[in-house]
Amino acid sequence: MSMQDPIADMITCIRNGQFSNKIFVIVPFSRLKENIVKVLKFEGYIINYKIKKNNNKVLKIFLKYFNGKSVIENIKRISRPSLRRYCNKRNLPIVMNNLGIAIISTSRGVMTDRIAREKGLGGEIICYVD
């Protein structure tokens, strides 16, 4: 795993885990990753997550399936280290006519586009999930 973009590595790990029907995936821990996974759990895209403290902290993410098919159809990284994507409160993205979510890092924490719209906040677009 390349550590140039740890968020993209986590997203790829989740995507690959669901393609291979894994029960859980393990990724290195960071607070930003934990906040992203909290949003995924709150929106019902994953079952649960746990923080494991072995030699170094890791996130154990339990993936969710419905009728043998993964709940997350597509998860895509938007803002990257080489090209940051920001939006203000008027230009927040709408993913799949509000059937999906955009995860946004704001000054008040990581949240979905819907919650950011309600609070009148903009920020960095981390990823799209549908």
UniProtKB/Swiss-Prot annotation:
Presence of the UniProt keyword GTP-binding in the record: no
The record's listing under Gene3D superfamilies reads:
3.30.1370.30, 3.30.1490.10
**What does the entry list under GO cellular component?**
ribonucleoprotein complex; ribosome
PROSITE patterns this protein is in? Answer: RIBOSOMAL_S8 (PS00053)
Pfam families for this protein: Ribosomal_S8 (PF00410)
Give GO BP annotations, semicolon-separated. translation
Q: Which GO terms describe its molecular function?
A: rRNA binding; structural constituent of ribosome
Alphabetized, the UniProt keywords read:
Ribonucleoprotein, Ribosomal protein, RNA-binding, rRNA-binding
Family label? Belongs to the universal ribosomal protein uS8 family.
| Role | One of the primary rRNA binding proteins, it binds directly to 16S rRNA central domain where it helps coordinate assembly of the platform of the 30S subunit.
This chain belongs to the protein called: Small ribosomal subunit protein uS8
What organism is this sequence from?
A: Buchnera aphidicola subsp. Cinara cedri (strain Cc)
